[in-house]
């Protein structure tokens, strides 16, 4: 078996090995998979294109490959505007879904899942890493301030001892 995509690797590991992040039933696995898909979508279509702008990555091949060539029409300012709007739409959709379906503190209730960890990573990246100051400026300092349910999930994940040990100050220390 050869897997070269980090998301496929995570799903494989969670499926193959029993552990604290393993879904407890097929229904829970489907729900977690749905949240995982949201995170993957957010990462691919918001975070990665923002990263291209932050780093000045101007190679159209990679931007076109991801179907997110935000710099193709209108340049950096238009790219930032479009990505900020996309961020807001995606976050609002997840927030509305969580308000209707989540009993908290995690995405599926009382158990942390691999989707919770990925959501935490996406949110903390925008809130704390150096390069995403561009998004913070446009969003009034915190891109997720209008989304309390999302922040509730991330705060719960951030309180997990293993997450604290692993993440530490890595987000704040990251230059981009």
Region roles according to the model:
Residues 21-31, 83, 102-115:
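All-alpha amphipathic helical-bundle segments outside canonical DNA-binding/catalytic cores
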Residues 36-43, 87, 121, 126:
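Alpha-helical transition-metal enzyme core signature, strongest for iron centers
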Residues 80-99:
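Amphipathic alpha-helical packing segments from all-alpha helical-bundle domains
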Residues 156-176:
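C-terminal helix/juxtamembrane-tail motif
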């Amino acid at each position: 078996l050869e897997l070269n995509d980090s998301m496929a690797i995570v799903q494989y590991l969670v499926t193959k090995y029993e552990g604290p992040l393993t879904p407890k039933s097929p229904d829970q696995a489907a729900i977690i998979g749905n949240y995982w898909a949201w995170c993957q979508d957010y990462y691919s279509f918001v975070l990665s294109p923002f990263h291209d702008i932050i780093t000045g990555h101007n190679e159209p091949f990679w931007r076109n490959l991801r179907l997110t060539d935000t710099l193709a029409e209108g340049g950096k300012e238009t790219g930032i505007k479009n990505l900020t709007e996309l961020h807001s739409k995606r976050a609002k959709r997840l927030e509305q879904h969580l308000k209707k379906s989540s009993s908290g503190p995690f995405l599926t209730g009382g158990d942390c899942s691999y989707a919770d960890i990925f959501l935490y990573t996406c949110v903390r990246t925008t809130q704390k890493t150096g390069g995403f100051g561009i998004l913070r400026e446009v969003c009034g300092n915190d891109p997720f301030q209008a989304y309390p349910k999302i922040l509730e999930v991330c705060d719960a994940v951030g309180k997990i001892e293993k997450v604290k040990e692993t993440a530490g100050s890595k987000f704040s220390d990251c230059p981009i």
